[in-house]
């Protein structure tokens, strides 16, 4: 016997379905559900008088071997793979199934079994994304990790040793001793971590020992001297060990111009940090590197998006982070050469075109570790308002644009750093690093942050209250962040060379340790929905940016979404 419901009744009970559109926070971005893998009339839902009860939606005979450990019911999945509705089953901390959950004794088409061993997260009306990946971290203080987790970031890659002067300016963990200590420190945190060694050296031996000590890659930074010899040597070693090289190029053009750096790179794959140049790099035209097929370009979030306040705040940030002196004219000139409104404005558009592939933070070193996700969506919203719907978005929603932008902080940094087999998307076989969002707070404040299939961070009310919701509602660490649970739900990434030498056993690491791989044969074409390689030119006098001969610019935003409406401070 069939039963009819209005679309509103259905959405209230089981969440939106195919044909429904959902607004993302207070932005002008809308998503439209492309497919619904749950079965109408056989949906599972938890609660008093609901479906997931013994002998109904819950299999009465299934043991733990036959059912999932956790199911997220009726979730709206937003991922580079699509925007669709499904149940998500998690087993042993991994995404085991995406589709229809329930009891196959009563229901057709069940992909994952709910049993007595299954926990439930009711995701009706909620958006689920992969945990964010921030691939430009200065590990200046451990408190960054809590802030990142609370924003929906579950993987951090970068370098540093704490608030040392070198770390404040450069993302390097230099030398085996420092790398080993940071690998040991990583044990404390319910987050995936990987550390970059110092790549600025014109001899191979000091670089090799860092990779064999556990570095996932090497970082070249102008403050250590990004010379042609250092670049070439670093890339030779990286090719041998299959690790990534990240680079912050020579702002002052002391050792050469952008053309000289590209010549030294010589077609080899490299991750270029803050490729627009405001965060550093060849002035004024490092941005043209984004047009080459071996360059994997990223932005950092202080320039995301370009607003009326962007230029003003950058000078002071730069003076502090790069140990400059306001009393020295040369230092002021150095700072001024970086901060160019023309290239920052072009950066917005290049992201929207899919030319810039990734967004990261540059944490506490001219970047905000808790705002990667917010600023990504603020940029997407600004571009829709200024440039209109993308040609690929011919329906009600902005699905293509949303998939392009979410790839910038999930799958693409995972691909670039050789960890896409483990994290970076909502796909079967990957670590269940998932973020659950109320659509009204999407991109701003997650409801739940899962690490390896267990809740690590969550909004939580007064612990002494009779229910979970009374004020003050704060982000608090949950059980996945405690005790030995964090060892089973998070990964420390190392080089394949270090993994094969048993670095985890040598250092007594309890956390899961996995090797990075598949990096040196990458090209920009491997970066999903953000793989464009146009010809980019910069006028050396006016700093105007042209893409395939066309001027690319935009106006600064005066108002952005996901801002003061959501925060007191």
Swiss-Prot record:
Domain (Urease): residue spans on this chain: 131-569
Family: Belongs to the metallo-dependent hydrolases superfamily. Urease alpha subunit family.
Cofactor: Ni cation
Subunit annotation: Heterotrimer of UreA (gamma), UreB (beta) and UreC (alpha) subunits. Three heterotrimers associate to form the active enzyme.
Binding site for Ni(2+) 2: 219, 248, 274
Pfam families (alphabetical): Amidohydro_1 (PF01979), Urease_alpha (PF00449)
Primary gene name: ureC
Subcellular location: Cytoplasm
GO MF annotation terms: nickel cation binding; urease activity
Residues the record lists as N6-carboxylysine modifications: 219
Active-site residues per Swiss-Prot or TrEMBL entry: 322
Name this protein carries in UniProt: Urease subunit alpha
Pathway involvement of the protein, from the record: Nitrogen metabolism; urea degradation; CO(2) and NH(3) from urea (urease route): step 1/1
EC numbers, comma separated: 3.5.1.5
Binding site for Ni(2+) 1: 136, 138, 219, 362
Keywords (A to Z) from UniProt: Cytoplasm, Hydrolase, Metal-binding, Nickel
Enzymatic reactions: urea + 2 H2O + H(+) = hydrogencarbonate + 2 NH4(+)
PROSITE patterns (UniProt xref): UREASE_1, UREASE_2, UREASE_3
Post-translational events: Carboxylation allows a single lysine to coordinate two nickel ions.
Cofactor binding note of this UniProt entry: Binds 2 nickel ions per subunit.
Originating species: Bacillus sp. (strain TB-90)
Gene Ontology annotations of biological process type: urea catabolic process
Binding site for substrate: 221
GO cellular component: cytoplasm
């Amino acid at each position: 016997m069939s039963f009819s419901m209005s679309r509103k009744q259905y959405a209230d009970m089981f969440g939106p379905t195919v044909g429904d559109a959902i607004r993302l926070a207070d932005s002008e971005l809308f998503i439209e559900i492309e497919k619904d893998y749950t079965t109408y009339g056989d949906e599972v839902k938890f609660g008093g008088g609901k479906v997931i009860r013994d002998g109904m939606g819950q299999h009465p005979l299934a043991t733990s071997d036959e059912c999932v450990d956790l199911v997220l019911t009726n979730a709206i999945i937003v991922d580079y793979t699509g925007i669709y509705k499904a149940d998500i089953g998690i087993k042993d901390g991994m995404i085991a199934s995406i589709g229809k959950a329930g009891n196959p004794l009563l229901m057709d088409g069940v992909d994952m079994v709910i049993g007595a061993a299954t926990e439930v997260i009711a995701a009706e009306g909620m958006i689920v994304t992969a945990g964010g990946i921030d691939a430009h971290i200065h590990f200046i203080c451990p408190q960054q990790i809590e802030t990142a987790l609370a924003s929906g970031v579950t993987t951090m890659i970068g370098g540093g040793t704490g608030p040392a002067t070198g770390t404040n300016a450069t993302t390097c963990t230099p030398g085996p001793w420092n790398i080993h200590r940071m690998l040991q420190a990583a044990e404390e945190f319910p987050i995936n971590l990987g550390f970059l060694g110092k790549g600025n050296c014109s001899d191979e031996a000091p670089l090799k020992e860092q990779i064999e000590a556990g570095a996932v890659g090497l970082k070249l930074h102008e403050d250590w001297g990004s010379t042609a010899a250092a670049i070439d040597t670093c890339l030779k070693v990286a090719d041998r060990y299959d690790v990534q090289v990240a680079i912050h190029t020579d702002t002052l053009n002391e050792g050469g111009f952008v053309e000289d750096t590209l010549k030294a790179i010589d077609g080899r794959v490299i991750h270029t940090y803050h490729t627009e140049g405001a965060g550093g790099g060849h002035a004024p035209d490092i941005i043209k590197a984004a047009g080459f097929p071996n360059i994997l370009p990223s932005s950092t979030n202080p320039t995301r998006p370009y607003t009326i306040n962007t230029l003003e705040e950058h000078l002071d940030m730069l003076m502090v982070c790069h140990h400059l002196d306001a009393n020295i004219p040369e230092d002021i000139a150095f700072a001024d050469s970086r901060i160019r409104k023309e290239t920052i404005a072009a950066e917005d558009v290049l992201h929207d075109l899919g030319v810039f592939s990734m967004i990261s933070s540059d944490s506490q070193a001219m970047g905000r570790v808790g705002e990667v996700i917010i600023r990504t969506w603020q940029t997407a919203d600004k571009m829709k308002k200024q440039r209109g719907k993308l040609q690929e978005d011919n329906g009600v929603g902005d699905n293509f644009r949303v998939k392009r932008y979410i790839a910038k902080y999930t799958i693409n940094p995972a691909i670039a750093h050789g960890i896409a087999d483990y994290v970076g998307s909502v796909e079967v076989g990957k670590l269940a690093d998932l973020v659950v969002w109320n659509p009204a707070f999407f991109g701003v404040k997650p409801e739940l942050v899962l690490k390896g299939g267990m809740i690590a961070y969550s909004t939580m009310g007064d612990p002494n209250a009779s229910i979970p919701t009374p004020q003050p509602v704060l982000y608090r660490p949950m059980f996945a962040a405690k005790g030995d649970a964090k060892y089973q739900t998070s990964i420390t990434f190392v080089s394949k060379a270090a993994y094969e030498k048993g670095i985890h056993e040598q250092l007594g690491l309890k956390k899961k340790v996995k090797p990075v791989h598949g990096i040196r044969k990458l090209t920009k074409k491997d970066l999903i929905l953000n793989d464009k390689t146009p010809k980019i030119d910069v006028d050396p006098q006016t700093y105007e940016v042209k893409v395939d001969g066309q001027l690319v610019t935009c106006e600064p935003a005066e108002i952005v979404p996901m801002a003061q409406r959501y925060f007191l401070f």
